[in-house]
Amino acid sequence: KTVGSKTKEMAHLLHQKNVRIKKCIFMTATERLFRGDSDEFMSMDDPRDYGSLIYELSFKEAINSKPPIISDYKIITFGITTPEIEEIYQSNKYLEVKKVLKDITAREFATAIALRKAIKKLKIKNAISFHRSIRRADNFRVQQDLITKIFPSYGKLKSFHVRGDMPTSDRAIQMRNFAEGEGLMTNARCLTEGVDLPAIDCVVFTDPKRSKVDIVQAAGRALRLSKGKKFGYI
């Protein structure tokens, strides 16, 4: 939060003239760096602001530690076969979804089907999906009810949705209901950090992500240790 422009509010905490601190330690799972020559920006590899690096722990070391610090993980991809695509279009099932979600793309629909296949095959219990917008995240939630109706062979999936502008009490209810059972939680960015639900065993990126920091932070939701969890799936 402190990295970036020296004039941003969070950077205020690093300036000795603002807050007098004798000793300070910084801990992060996602080091943020600024590349450039400007003195107007702060970067975590600058010892003038953040001090010298005293310890670093890799993902591999955290997984292989005895006992482990985080869960091992697998990166998986699921696709839709040609026969499945033909069956979906020939039976007009895609059109049924389009009647409800007029702006849904074939790719979004295929992603929802692929997630159901992954849940069924890998016995995933609690998944969270990340989307590039709140609207797409909420649409993905609505899709799940339609898929349950159109493809009963995939079983039922409880779906929840949270967003940053939700009242805190409403968001807490959604998170509690999700944590107490099995299902899917959709969001845009509000679950990227600050969430500690060990039961989460799958993270889904429904839209391309280019930020390494965002990817690591989001993937970390599925790497908390939990009884019975062998892998976190990404």
Predicted segments — roles?
Residues V3-G4, L33-S38, E84-E87, V195-D196, ...:
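Switch/connector loops and helix/strand junctions flanking conserved nucleotide-binding motifs
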Residues E9-L13, E40, N139-L146, Q174, ...:
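Alpha-helical scaffold elements adjacent to nucleotide-binding pockets in ATP/GTP-utilizing enzyme cores
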Residues V3-I70:
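Post-DEXD/H (motif II) to motif III coupling segment of the RecA-like Helicase ATP-binding lobe
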Residues S159-I234:
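Conserved RecA-like P-loop NTPase helicase motor core
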Residues G51-R135:
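Conserved interdomain linker/interface between the two RecA-like ATPase lobes of SF2 helicase motors
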Residues K8, K98-A188, K209:
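Conserved C-terminal RecA-like helicase domain
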Residues V19-K23, Y50-S52, I69-Y73, G155-K158, ...:
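Short glycine-/polar-rich loops that comprise or flank the Walker A/P-loop
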Residues M27-E31, S133, R189-C190:
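A short beta-strand-to-loop transition that corresponds to the Sensor-1 phosphate-sensing loop
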